[in-house]
Amino acid sequence: KTPITVSRLLLDEMEDTDNVEHLKTEMIYIEGYVNMALSYLKLFNHERDMDITSVELDKVINPILKRYSRIFIRNHIGLIYENRGDRVITDAKWLSALLEQIISNAVKYTKNGKVKISFDREKNRLVISDSGIGIRSEDIPKIFDKGYSGFNGRLNQKSSGIGLYMVKKIAHKLSITIDVESEVGKGSSFFIYFNELHRKNGV
């Protein structure tokens, strides 16, 4: 068992108090950072472990939502997401790493709000929106830069400056395009466009 798993089991055996709940939430973040670090190392280790195939989005998204369910509850975040069986042509493992970063940011910077996840079949794009603190317009062009945490990251002291940089690299690996719209105090939307050639060629 990993130290994280052991710590989680010990916390589960303890009486639920505010401190224990806080520690359980922090364990989710720690596990997320570990997953991010492992994905980061694999990404730059020149591994050719791509498996481009037809992937059901629900099977990628639902495990991520389950991992972060405690934070959804703790931060009083409503989730708008419908399992529809939509499929895309991509690599499931790398897509999961990409989506986890975006979803974890959404719940990290949203309180008493909502997160919405939807798929536009016509445009072959996944949209992840939140009603969180938003991103300053001057920060948006830089959020995918390595080490850049922006004003919100410095304010909340929760940003590694690596997550969205890794998202950009994975997106390039998967031939995915990402657009971002955001307004401070109103929230952010990430538009994830899947490769049209993959869809047309069925590869």
Residue ranges and their predicted role:
Residues 45-50, 87-93:
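Conserved micro-motifs of the catalytic ATP-binding
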Residues 114-124:
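Short beta-strand/loop element within the Bergerat-fold HATPase_c
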Residues 174-176:
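Conserved glycine-rich
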Residues 148-158:
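Glycine-rich ATP-lid/hinge loop adjacent to the conserved G-boxes
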Residues 130:
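Acidic ATP/Mg2+-coordinating residue in the GHKL
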Residues 135-148:
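Short conserved segment of the HATPase_c
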